C-alpha cells in the first residue's frame, strides 16, 4: 500500500520537530526519522494502529515518543491525517 501524507500532517510533524530542535537539533532529527520509519511500517501492516477515536480512523502510537499519528486506510492507500502530542487536547476534526 502507498502512504499519503496530508499537508496538515506534514505541517504537524515539521512543527513538532521544530519545537524539539529548539532544545536539541539532534533529537529533533531522531524524532522526525523515527516517526517516518514508524509510518512506513503501515505499508506492510495497515491495521497496526489501534482503532481511532474518530470513526473510520486508526491511531499509530509512536514508540519512545509521546505522539500519536491518526490515519485512514483506503482501498489502495493509507492517509496520514495528523501528528499529535499525547498531552494536547484532541481536536474536534482531523
Give the label of every model feature segment:
Residues 2-57, 74-77, 93:
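Basic, Lys/Arg-enriched alpha-helical interface segments
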Residues 7, 62-64:
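Conserved strand-loop elements at the edges of beta-sheets that form or border functional pockets
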Residues 41-42, 63, 83:
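Conserved catalytic core of Hanks-type protein kinase domains
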Residues 57, 66-68:
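Short hydrophobic/aromatic beta-strand or adjacent loop that forms the aromatic wall/cage
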Residues 68, 72-94:
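Enriched for short, Lys/Arg-rich terminal
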Amino acid at each position: 500500500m502507498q502512504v499519503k501524507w496530508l499537508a496538515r500532517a506534514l505541517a504537524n510533524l515539521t512543527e513538532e520537530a521544530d519545537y524539539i530542535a529548539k532544545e536539541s537539533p539532534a533529537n529533533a532529527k531522531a524524532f522526525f526519522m523515527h516517526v517516518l520509519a514508524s509510518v512506513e511500517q503501515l505499508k506492510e501492516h495497515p491495521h497496526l494502529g489501534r482503532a481511532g477515536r474518530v470513526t473510520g480512523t486508526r491511531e499509530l502510537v509512536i514508540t519512545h515518543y509521546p505522539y500519536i499519528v491518526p490515519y485512514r486506510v483506503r482501498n489502495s492507500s493509507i492517509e496520514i491525517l495528523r501528528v499529535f502530542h499525547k498531552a494536547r487536547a484532541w481536536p474536534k476534526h482531523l
